[in-house]
Amino acid sequence: MLEKTIYRKLLSNAFDIPVSVTYWDGKTEDYGQGTPEVKVKIRQAFPLRELTSAPTLVLGEAYMNEDLLIEGDHAIQKLVTSAYRKSGSFLKKNSFLKHFPKMSHSKADSKEDIQSHYDIGNDFYGMWLDKTMTYSCAYFQHEDDTLEQAQINKVHHILNKLDITDGGSLLDIGSGWGTVLFIAAEEYGVHATGVTLSQEQYNYTKQQIKQRRLEDKIDVYLEDYRDLQGQYDYVTSVGMFEHVGKENLAEYFQTVKRLLKPNGRALIHGITGQHDGAGVDPFIIKYIFPGGYIPNMVENLQHVMDA
């Protein structure tokens, strides 16, 4: 009885929209004002200590195992958005974050993390990425742009900002499936070099280089970017620093500087948050982006200045 009382207290203040909750004993309670927009059914009680310390992981796994059922139009999106808006929601409290900065992120860890995410097969990513196989934020210049066009827009936007001149050298850190490399070499006249820890991405890029007959214009390496030598006129890194880990951010920006020629130019594109640990979530770390960390703007700017 005490367990359910605690559940009721937590859930009654978890969302800012009306929600109907059916508990494991079959009883239903409505929380919030108005007709429930979402119906939640909890088929069994979850350990309270785990629920309150890592709620997204516990509830995410429960949903996967069908111990938690959610009904309603765009129900999951509504619940997540509502929880983030709700002041004091237990779903935003996560003791997991306190331990995150202490997690190991060596070169071996980085390789394992990247391969666990990207080496599940190019066929899988090809099912839902656009034809360029670009796996980062797109730039929709016009409402009717396709995803493919928006990804191409993004690459041109990056390369134009670098004010590239013919004959220069460009390094793309975390080159993925090679889109930046191909466009830079074919349309901007540079010698492009890419580096990735993903065997699948490396194989795909090598194949594309051969098919496009760009062997004399593009190099790609399967290694840690920190092991690279030499210097380049331009350095790009798109959607990469989210993978390096909090404790390696300083080294990341220092490495970018080391690899850049004097008076060279770099463009770093990534996702940032407004506060420490933004975007770090135990469910995402376990199932989607192991080792991932979303830095805030202050962190990034400080590391750039220190480099």
What role is predicted for each listed range?
Residues 177-188:
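Conserved SAM-binding loop of SAM-dependent methyltransferases across substrates and taxa
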Residues 263-271:
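Conserved beta-strand signature within the Rossmann-like core of class I S-adenosyl-L-methionine
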Residues 226-235:
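A short acidic, Gly/Pro-enriched loop at the edge of an enzyme's catalytic core
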Residues 1-151, 157, 161, 186:
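Feature captures hydrophobic
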Residues 271-307:
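Substrate-binding/catalytic lobe of Class I Rossmann-like enzymes that use SAM or dcSAM, i.e.
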Residues 166-174:
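Conserved class I S-adenosyl-L-methionine
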Residues 250-262:
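A short glycine-rich, Lys/Arg-flanked "PGG" loop and its adjoining helix->strand segment in the class I
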Residues 186-226:
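Class I SAM-dependent methyltransferase SAM/SAH-binding core
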